Amino acid sequence: MTSNIVFSEKKQKDMEWAKGIVARIEADRREFVKYKDSRPITDIKHMIETSAELYGDNTAFYQKYKGDETFTAISYRQMIEKVNGLGTALIHHGLQGKRIAVIGENSSEWAISYLAVICGTGIVVPLDKELSKEELKHLVQRAEVSCVLCSSKYRSVFQDISAELDQSLMLVDFFAEKETEGVFSLSELIDEGKALLQKGERQFVEAEIDSDAMSVILFTSGTTGASKGVMLNHKNLAADLMVSPTVLKVNTWDIFFSVLPLHHTYECTCGFLMPLYKGAAIGYCQGLKYIVKNLQEVRPTMFLGVPAIFENLYRTIWKNIRKQGKEKLVKRMIGLNRMTKKIGLDLSGKLFRQITSVFGGRLRLMICGGAAINPQVLNGIGDFGILALQGYGLTECSPMGALNPDTAPNPSSIGVCFPGFELKTVDLNEEGIGEICIRGDNVMMGYYQMPEETAAVIDEDQWFHTGDLGYIDENGYAYITGRKKNVIITKNGKNVYPEELEYQLSLSPYIEESFVFSSTQPGESDISIVASIRPDMELIREELPTEPTDQDIKTILWEEVDKINKTAPLYRRIRKLILRKTEFVKNTSNKLVRFAEENKVE
């Protein structure tokens, strides 16, 4: 622990900065800024050390290892001991100030590796485990990585990469019991570091963090081509941690369920660092196929996800209800509960206990990010007594941009701006839609080795231009209509936002996913709006007495498209429909890769 170390002048200035953020939180008079118990932190090292002091015996991580029947609990005290041990060993092996990659499945080993690097060793480079060997090799070279801490699954991949590169990589296996083939064991390094600490080695534990220096390089999973390396510092992350729990109550007894990849800043900041800041616990999912099983074992209270996960879970609930022949009964129960809620009586806990037991029985909050979600799904989950909120963020904002307050959620909105951060729209069109811009301590330092790209998105007044289009209502709630680069402009200068149409199509139960684009045909005076649609074949088969033909499917889909066209101006109407039978191309964040789909169509 370093709580008794006298702060340097720089550290004292950092503490004044942190106290300033807390003061702005306390001064915020917006009704939905309800929770004002944030403690000032100067950096992530300061955060985990103070959390270990405050919550020492509380559980930090729940993890189930291969072959185990139950989850293992790791306390905050054990966590800090492991972090200090690993950090001390890494410095002893000559890695201070180096770039160190972390890659693997979500686990406490991933978390401890990340913390050991960022809290005094060097610069952490979280890598996407879904990338190919060639892509990983390219990123290792770009980031000038000296060491890779990885799960056993990726050991051989990086052994090959190391052999192909001019410089050798120090490799550390999360789960190896001992060093073999020149690959270090994480547990052995932790023990080595603990022994060095007992002998008086203090270089890691007494390291003073420069909160303004680059500490993280996060490579974005671009939907338009080459990824960019987002440079973050400790202030970016600390600012997010201090402001994010102000519109959302997080308790020390909460258990977060970690299923999204930790290399994504959404999960890393909100599902990993933020729970540790608030003294909560994190339960690691063993993989997507184990979600339901692990939910019942961990019995979490909070769950971060993306639309695809929430929509699949919600769809599964209703499919099970229909199979049991209880659809009418459940709908009556939902109607009854909605009525009693109006007089302050929430019966969901009693009425839907059997349904919510699928999630472990204690889940109180689900937060959706990464892309727009159907508000009907959020409301539908809420009907069962689980509050479902939508948020908004970007890697470039560490990632917090906006979040719906738990006391005043708006399912159609991405949320409100956090205390101390700023949100605005610029270059508004005749419909009042403009580009969303964000300013605050959460905004990145810039793109790694890309000064021109950085200058294109961060203006001279330090506003980050997100590239997202939308508007902000009179109550401060923000809404997204699409991406600036994806706007379809008709010959008359009218704007069509494909994401907006895709979102409207997603509201149909018969549509699994869609891709909207423009097409110009010979002899046509203007562009046509085209929708490529992948239907929900299971539901369509349930609706029809015989196996549906392509024409049957298109008839159903056109009925859904016509519902949208009836309320849309002529220039925004979908004129052509393409039946899609396979999934669309996605990146590792599960987002549609538009340029790949456009090339397919061409």
Regions found by a protein language model. Name each.
Residues 56-59, 194-219, 226, 249-255:
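Conserved pre-ATP/AMP-binding loop-to-beta segment of ANL
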Residues 238-255, 262-352, 362:
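Conserved AMP-binding/adenylation subdomain of ANL enzymes
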Residues 515-520, 559-602:
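Conserved C-terminal "lid"/linker of ANL adenylate-forming enzymes
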Residues 2-14, 119-192:
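Structural core segment of the AMP-binding/adenylate-forming
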Residues 72-77, 215-241:
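Conserved AMP-binding A3 loop
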Residues 57-107, 111-115, 132-141, 187, ...:
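Conserved AMP-binding/adenylate-forming core of the ANL superfamily
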Residues 131, 148, 440, 445-446, ...:
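AMP-binding/adenylate-forming catalytic core of the ANL superfamily
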Residues 417, 424, 430-490:
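Conserved ATP-binding/catalytic segment of the ANL
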